[in-house]
Structures are given as structure tokens and as C-alpha cells.
């Protein structure tokens, strides 16, 4: 019997896959537990429609990420920070991913989620820095930071 998997089933198939499985296994286990449904022409059509919609959504997300990357790659896109500095040259506050995200939104109107900014530890020094940001699973960019003394 041909079934469409509604969830990942270890050793049998992944969500969205159409596979031939034994009839008893399909009726008594997969369909009863809502792990799969019978592959009729209507359900196959629905699945293809969902996959097309998902691809379209992914393409839109990628295009949006590329637009953000284009803005971040411009030379004039440099996020400015003014921090108080102690006698040892270290800042009193630290620059975190959250602060970078907020300033990017405030200064350039570019919205980047703080979880996508790859910052090993908060920045506590003055100077110029480049911080990588993961905009999409296949697209990364660099945020340029200029931290000056207040």
C-alpha cells in the first residue's frame, strides 16, 4: 500500500515522502497513529501543493536575507557605539548581540534577530570590529561595528 508520511518514522520514511509499505503495517500502525495517510491522487495533489508553497516561502526568505546582506555589505553601513572607557582601555558596558541588533534597527532600519548574530563573547574594547551574522542557512554576512570612547 502506498502511503504519505505525515511525520518522520525511523527506518521507514521522512515527513512528506510517498512510499510503498505492507498493507497491514500501514492500516494497523501508521494510519492509526496518524504517522501516515493513504496516498490517493487527491492527497498526492495536496502534498505537491504544500511542497510548492513551502519552496515559494523559502525563496522569499532567501530573497529577504539577500537584501539584508546587500545593505550590510555596503561600506557606509557601520554600526556606531559610544561607550564609557575605564583607565585600562576596556569599556564599562559590553556590546552584546542584543545591543547590536537594536542599534542596527535604530541606525539603518535593518531587522536582524539577535540569535543570528554570531558573537562568542560580548565585546568590551574600543575599535573596529566585524561580527558575522547568519542570515539564512546558506547565507552569511558581516556587521561592521565602530566602538568609540564617549
UniProtKB/Swiss-Prot annotation:
Q: Give me the Gene Ontology terms describing cellular component.
A: ribonucleoprotein complex; ribosome
- Give the Gene Ontology MF terms in alphabetical order: rRNA binding; structural constituent of ribosome
Cross-referenced Gene3D superfamilies: Ribosomal protein L9, C-terminal domain, Ribosomal protein L9, N-terminal domain
Its signal peptide is: none
> What are the record keywords, sorted?
Ribonucleoprotein, Ribosomal protein, RNA-binding, rRNA-binding
Question: Would you kindly state one Gene Ontology biological process term found in this protein's UniProt entry?
Answer: translation
Q: Which InterPro entries match?
A: Ribosomal_bL9, Ribosomal_bL9/RNase_H1_N, Ribosomal_bL9_bac/chp, Ribosomal_bL9_C, Ribosomal_bL9_C_sf, Ribosomal_bL9_N, Ribosomal_bL9_N_sf
- PROSITE patterns recorded for this chain? RIBOSOMAL_L9
Q: Which domain of life is it from?
A: Bacteria
Instruction: Return the Pfam families for the record.
Output: Ribosomal_L9_C, Ribosomal_L9_N
Homology family: Belongs to the bacterial ribosomal protein bL9 family.
Task: State what this protein does.
Answer: Binds to the 23S rRNA.
NCBIfam families (alphabetical): L9 (TIGR00158)
Indicate what this protein is called per its UniProt record: Large ribosomal subunit protein bL9
Task: Please report the organism this UniProt entry assigns to the protein.
Answer: Streptococcus pyogenes serotype M5 (strain Manfredo)
Its organism's taxonomic lineage begins at: Bacteria, Bacillati, Bacillota, Bacilli, Lactobacillales
Amino acid at each position: 500500500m502506498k502511503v504519505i508520511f505525515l511525520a518522520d518514522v525511523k527506518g521507514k520514511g521522512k515527513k512528506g515522502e510517498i512510499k510503498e509499505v505492507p498493507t497491514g503495517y500501514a492500516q494497523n500502525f501508521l494510519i492509526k497513529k496518524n504517522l501516515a495517510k493513504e496516498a490517493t491522487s487527491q492527497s498526492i495533489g495536496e502534498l505537491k501543493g504544500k511542497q510548492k508553497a513551502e519552496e515559494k516561502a523559502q525563496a522569499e526568505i532567501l530573497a529577504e536575507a539577500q537584501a539584508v546582506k546587500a545593505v550590510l555589505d555596503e561600506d557606509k553601513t557601520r554600526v556606531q557605539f559610544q561607550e564609557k572607557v575605564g583607565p585600562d582601555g576596556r569599556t564599562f558596558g559590553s556590546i552584546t548581540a542584543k545591543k547590536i541588533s537594536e542599534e542596527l534597527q535604530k541606525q539603518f532600519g535593518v531587522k536582524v534577530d539577535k540569535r543570528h548574530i554570531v558573537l562568542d563573547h560580548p565585546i568590551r574594547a574600543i575599535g573596529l570590529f566585524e561580527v558575522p551574522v547568519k542570515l539564512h542557512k546558506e547565507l552569511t554576512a558581516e556587521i561592521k561595528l565602530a566602538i568609540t570612547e564617549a
